[in-house]
Amino acid sequence: MDEREGQSMSRKRDGARNFFPMPQKIFNLGMNAGEIAVYTYLMFRENRKTYQCYPSYRTIGDAVGMSRNTVKKYVDALVEKQLIYVEPTKVKTRDGGMRNGNLLYTIRPLEAALEYHLEQQMKTYSQQTLARQGTSPV
């Protein structure tokens, strides 16, 4: 390898602009591969100051190789797991009317999702314990 090739390779690997942080704790939340893919894409697109982004289902699907309906299913799961908050937006049309815009996604603090996940695990454990004992939950 000559000097020019070595410089070219180091430039390709250089720069934090080609990377974004992903918290390791997402692997402790019982997420499946589809949920991780959608969550990762939202983290990639988020504004690092507001923790928000607004890609369409189609844009997310194109990026992660899923249909619009599959993306919606995983977004709903991420909301349920308290990893993201979703709110509708409105856009003004050229003729002055209003129409629905893309959803606005807010990436929530991971601690809330971890707490929710642990609560769900405790509920499941309690229900299983009661079922083994032959009693029903109150």
Where are these regions (language model features)?
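A general lysine-centric signal
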Residues: 72-73, 81
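Charged low-complexity intrinsically disordered patches
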Residues: 1-11, 80, 106-138
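Short, cationic-aromatic polyanion-contact patches
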Residues: 56, 89-116
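A short, conserved structural fragment
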Residues: 80-90
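Compositionally biased, intrinsically disordered/low-complexity regions enriched for serine, proline
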Residues: 18-20, 52, 85, 106, ...
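Short recognition helix of helix-turn-helix/winged-helix DNA-binding domains
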Residues: 1-70, 76, 98
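Generic alpha-helical propensity signal that fires on short helical segments
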Residues: 49-51, 56, 84, 102, ...
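Short, low-complexity, polar/charged sequence segments that are solvent-exposed and flexible
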Residues: 57-61, 74, 104-106, 124-127
